[in-house]
């Protein structure tokens, strides 16, 4: 098996948002995805779903960031040093983002969503509807993840 395979992707659209910096992490942020005109008919029926998965290219990650192999989750030194595949860091060999968003509106080749943690101009690679099969009933996470989740929940309250 050769690991030299090169994959060339063409964005299906681009993110349009006024959010900047850490604001994009706010799950209340409203964004638009402007799809290529010739893909408009591919959106037919998507309005029947409440939530979607958006796959996007993290184009602001540097070449050095793509070489990162270990990180502390959320950049916090009080968290364990882990391999990047055990975290949700954007620094990875193939900087692909994946976010579940709430679909608010579809108009022509533009969809409006809530909760997309991507910057203005981010290339969108694909979109898929979210359904009940995408929820695991018996998942587990490590202790450090539970700590971060508890802190995030307490911060919201």
Each PLM stretch: what is its role?
Residues 1-100, 104-157:
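Glycine-rich, low-complexity intrinsically disordered segments
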């Amino acid at each position: 098996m050769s690991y030299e395979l090169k994959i060339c992707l063409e964005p299906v659209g681009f993110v349009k948002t006024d959010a900047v910096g850490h604001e994009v992490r706010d799950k209340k942020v409203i964004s638009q995805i402007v799809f290529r005109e010739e893909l408009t008919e591919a959106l037919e029926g998507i309005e029947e779903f409440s939530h979607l998965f958006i796959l996007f290219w993290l184009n602001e990650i540097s070449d050095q960031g793509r070489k990162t192999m270990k990180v502390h989750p959320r950049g916090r030194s009080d968290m364990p040093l882990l391999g990047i595949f055990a975290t949700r860091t954007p620094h990875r060999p193939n900087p692909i983002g994946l976010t579940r968003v709430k679909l608010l509106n579809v108009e022509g080749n533009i969809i409006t969503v809530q909760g997309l943690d991507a910057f203005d101009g981010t290339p969108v690679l694909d979109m898929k509807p979210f359904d009940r099969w995408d929820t695991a009933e018996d998942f587990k996470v490590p202790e450090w993840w539970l700590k971060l989740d508890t802190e995030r929940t307490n911060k919201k309250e």
